[in-house]
Amino acid sequence: MKVSLLIFLIILVGVIKSFDINSIDDSHWESDEGFEHHKCWKNLTGYYTEFALSAYNTMFPTPYGVIPVSFYEGGVVTADIKGQQMYVHYGIVAKNFTTWGQYYAYGKNQTQYVVNNSSCVAMKLQFPFPDKLPKFKKVGTTKIGQTDVDVWIVKGKQQCNVTRSCILIQKDTCTLMSANFGNKDKSNLGFSLLNYYRYENKPHYDKFQLPSQCWDVKPKDENENKEEQGLFANEEELENKEYFGDNQQAPSMRITKNNPHLNNNNNNKKYHHREHETPNPDLIKTTTKTSTKTTSFSRATNDSPKSIDFHHLF
């Protein structure tokens, strides 16, 4: 999530001895100076990695606006940059739900698929699949345990300037070790930590094969897509009006058997998630307010609500 481009002189930071994303001066993100395509990935065709992501109160773009979310996600991701395809095997735990499944994205036919509970949902890919990685700037060095790493900040687009992100790369090996995200607004602290395991600088092509349950599935229309993408939505987060503007009532998401279709016609703009299959009791966390489940998700990212930009990688 990005920043207006302000041009002024940058004094480079030498060594970050005790690493904290807040220890990196904001001015590094506010100028184009020093950003370049990392030498390790200039000819990168893709990647594969296992990952674990923990987020607390971190600002994320969603179909309902930019909201703070807290969740844990783990899994596997691989992307073929040249072939414009991505696969994610994910498991997510958040306040009101637990879910897991597989995500497939294909830039060439502009379609994405989510497989959850053996069912498949297809949606139009409403963002361009990137053909290269973003630019980086080295701002220091530190250690993970006793492993020396370089600290690189990520330069992205301007659409959603609410978080800062950096990555830690093992010296001389081009191996991703970790990534850190933090809310730009220091009065509303939020952080995410993303660790990489078994990282490889090449895609696993066998993962891009679409499963048979998706072969005859057609993309849904745009209205249904919005409700499908509301993965992290819960009442406490969506009713935070600060991130929806002064004149927009923050929507609320409930799941009920009596409201099987998305309803956005009432005065309070209450949104109801559409039921797609019989709920699996193991995937539903019940609270006094509502029983919550999700059947799919969107690869919403820290770069833009309309850009993949390799969320799991950077």
Swiss-Prot record:
<keyword id="KW-0732">Signal</keyword>
<dbReference type="GO" id="GO:0005576">
    <property type="term" value="C:extracellular region"/>
</dbReference>
<feature type="glycosylation site" description="N-linked (GlcNAc...) asparagine">
    <location>
        <position position="116"/>
    </location>
</feature>
<feature type="compositionally biased region" description="Low complexity">
    <location>
        <begin position="285"/>
        <end position="296"/>
    </location>
</feature>
<keyword id="KW-0325">Glycoprotein</keyword>
<feature type="glycosylation site" description="N-linked (GlcNAc...) asparagine">
    <location>
        <position position="96"/>
    </location>
</feature>
<feature type="glycosylation site" description="N-linked (GlcNAc...) asparagine">
    <location>
        <position position="161"/>
    </location>
</feature>
<feature type="compositionally biased region" description="Low complexity">
    <location>
        <begin position="257"/>
        <end position="268"/>
    </location>
</feature>
<protein>
    <recommendedName>
        <fullName>Uncharacterized protein DDB_G0292248</fullName>
    </recommendedName>
</protein>
<feature type="glycosylation site" description="N-linked (GlcNAc...) asparagine">
    <location>
        <position position="43"/>
    </location>
</feature>
<feature type="glycosylation site" description="N-linked (GlcNAc...) asparagine">
    <location>
        <position position="109"/>
    </location>
</feature>
<feature type="signal peptide">
    <location>
        <begin position="1"/>
        <end position="18"/>
    </location>
</feature>
<keyword id="KW-0964">Secreted</keyword>
<feature type="glycosylation site" description="N-linked (GlcNAc...) asparagine">
    <location>
        <position position="117"/>
    </location>
</feature>
<dbReference type="InterPro" id="IPR040310">
    <property type="entry name" value="DDB_G0292248-like"/>
</dbReference>
<feature type="region of interest" description="Disordered">
    <location>
        <begin position="252"/>
        <end position="314"/>
    </location>
</feature>
